[in-house]
Curated annotation (Swiss-Prot):
One Pfam family named in its UniProt record: Cytomega_US3
Post-translational modification: The signal sequence is not cleaved.
Protein name: Unique short US2 glycoprotein
Subunit structure: Monomer. Interacts with host TRAM1.
TM regions (residue ranges): 162-182
Intrachain S-S bonds: 52-133
Coiled-coil annotated residue ranges, if any: none
Organism field: Human cytomegalovirus (strain Merlin) (HHV-5)
Family affiliation: Belongs to the cytomegalovirus US2 family.
Name of the encoding gene: US2
Amino acid sequence: MNNLWKAWVGLWTSMGPLIRLPDGITKAGEDALRPWKSTAKHPWFEIEDNRCYIDNGKLFARGSIVGNMSRFVFDPKADYGGVGENLYVHADDVEFVPGESLKWNVRNLDVMPIFETLALRLVLQGDVIWLRCVPELRVDYTSSAYMWNMQYGMVRKSYTHVAWTIVFYSINITLLVLFIVYVTVDCNLSMMWMRFFVC
């Protein structure tokens, strides 16, 4: 399954706006509050927060940098094993106070199950700073993201994750089928439900 995903990303790389990311820190929670690549000669900025998590296929991230800056570039990328895809954020996801701070709170970004880390390329006062965030995975097996959860488990070879996804998906489908059969077989019950939804 891993080779299939790698081949798919390779094909996507040849077609889409993907870039090669620099090598850097990959351990979760380690060195998240310092850049792994920076052209800044002196550390004139301070990273106050850099966190992210995946919730059923959606990426959420927040962070902040404090320092005397008058201009910035905020360029987040999804890291798919060293290959980065540009992530597009809304203007109101980033808050910039000139001379004081840059804060971001990115929500509901779609990422593929082979997502590894969030790479942030920041240009502050002309200095290029790279941050990396390894996401925490939050799973709700009762959500509608069954395929994403199943693919994530297959890519990570977490077969327990795949099994729980299949179990909850089967329960939901069974309940749906029982409800449809129960309502359509009993005509009186069908009319009652129709009146309920019409009114």
